[in-house]
Amino acid sequence: MRILHLIYSLNVGGAERMVITLANYQVQSNQVGLCIINNLYSQKLLNELDSRIQVFRINRKKASRNILDVFQLNRYVFKFHPDILHIHDSDAILYIPIRSFYHTILTIHAMDLPLKGYKLYNQTVAISKAVADNTENRGLCRPEVIYNGISTSAIQRTKKNIPNAEQNFRIVQVGRLEHGIKGQHLILKALHRLSSSHISVDFIGDGSSYNYLKEVTRQLKLEKQVNFLGNRDIEWIYHHLCDYHLLVQPSISEGFGLTIAEGMAAGVPVLVSDLPAPLEIIDKGKQGYYFRHNDVDDLCRMLRYIIKHYEEALQLSDKAQTFVTVNFDSKLIAQQYINLYNEYIYKTHTK
């Protein structure tokens, strides 16, 4: 089977991570290509791709309307001639007039995304039930749900230990520094209110809110407790998540929450906002803790509870490791996509 993935950019994010994981799995038994439309991509992420994957880079400037970019896009699609054209940004299909020659699939990676061209796709997939509900509530056909996947076997497991009074309780948050979406400022405000010098927070990721979050850290006099580590490659993350006592994901908007699943796979207790998608991952509180989203008081309450009852949190994290392996392992997720592709091919051949 020939599978071509199409995405606007390849920087750090859940959609990009899924595309890489999916392509690397699929190339084991298929011919796989990846087309990146814009000139926004991370060489580190490209280096994670299997060498057998054919990469096409159009290098379009963001928001450009250069007709030559459209021509180049269609030339690459025609050249690869996929059985499956798997697109990860909805409106990209509008720029592929030769789309009718291929079976097109859209994966919707977040809530409230503009979905121009949605009805042109042969099949649509959402990365969570929450995203599927959000899509249906906008008057569009409900997409099938296939969760994002993680390589659970590649994630180093934590050594269970309860920090003593002299040790720092280490919190980690992983994601783009976009506080209006990911809510990192809530952690800073909660840390300030807790008034404990034995709690530290590491932010892993980069983004447009970096300067704002650094300034909030300075204003709250948290410089000795807060570290901004910048982007880290997936190998580093998978190796070091286990160094932390708690992963906090205080999202204000979230379509899935890949790093929540990664923390669970590492055996790290997790605390997430009570949005529908994160609650799916922690099985409505059976596999992790949650607080009212955008509520610093409730975040403080739950942080105090987890620190005080950390032995309970570790027991919960043991269950969560099994849960995430059974439900979100990348091999399982990738196979679900292969099954979806094969379903189309079978129907085509039996017409």
Regions inferred by a protein language model and the residue ranges of each:
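Short hydrophobic beta-strand element within catalytic cores of glycosyltransferases
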Residues: P269-V272
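Aromatic "clamp/platform" in nucleotide-sugar-dependent glycosyltransferases that forms part
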Residues: I252
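Short His-centered aromatic/hydrophobic patch
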Residues: R65-D69, H86-I93, I108
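A conserved mid-protein helix/loop that constitutes part of the nucleotide-sugar donor-binding site
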Residues: E16-T21, F169, E178-R193, S208-K214, ...
